[in-house]
Amino acid sequence: HRIATTAALSSDARTLTLVGGGDPTLSETALRTMAGKAAEALREDDKDSVRLTYDTSRYTGPVLHPISPNENIAPVTALMVNEGRLDDTDRGVADRSEDPAGDAARTFAAQLEKAGVKVTGEPREARADDKARTVATHRSAPLSALVERTLTNSDNDIAEALARQTAIAKGEKASFAGARRAVTNELKKLRIPVADAHFADGSGLDRKGRVTPALLTALLARAADP
């Protein structure tokens, strides 16, 4: 499975919507490629200008982690570029954007302009039209690679994203609460003891989170012999 970020063009080809799928590793390079494909679609419709909106509805509930603002984690939103980092790092602490979704949309707008498309007005948040067609897609690295990066770098942003992807896959809302329910239920199915444990978030940064020695031992044993 890979997390998809898409660009959807309205039926009248007047509005382009950047739709976040929950990929915190989305890069400016990926947005450049998407902008090029979107520009091609607009030219096929004889359009050289477009309104730009951005859709973060994949996630619900609070955006700010309980410890936010904090250099260890960005606002948890379905759309961001490079984990909302304000520098060129890809791991460790860093100053974070207060509006990663809006920043991603503005970056996409700049790439559209470079591709020859005039973006009218400022990008605004709105859901994609139900009749809009997808004109560009970027897919993340496989989930296995995201898990490896999370564990190697202790990456809080990807950890939160993975928790929400679990929630989505299990029919829960992609929120802190939905992720908690999904993760807890999946551990129960694996017969991992969850008594006295509390998964307050996906990253473990919330001080209300608790795990027990029994849970950790059972989880490590299961991982060693799946």
Where are these regions (language model features)?
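A small/polar active-site loop signature that marks catalytic segments
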Residues: V81-P226
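Active-site-adjacent loops and short helices of periplasmic peptidoglycan-processing enzymes
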Residues: H1-D103, K114-E148, T152-N156
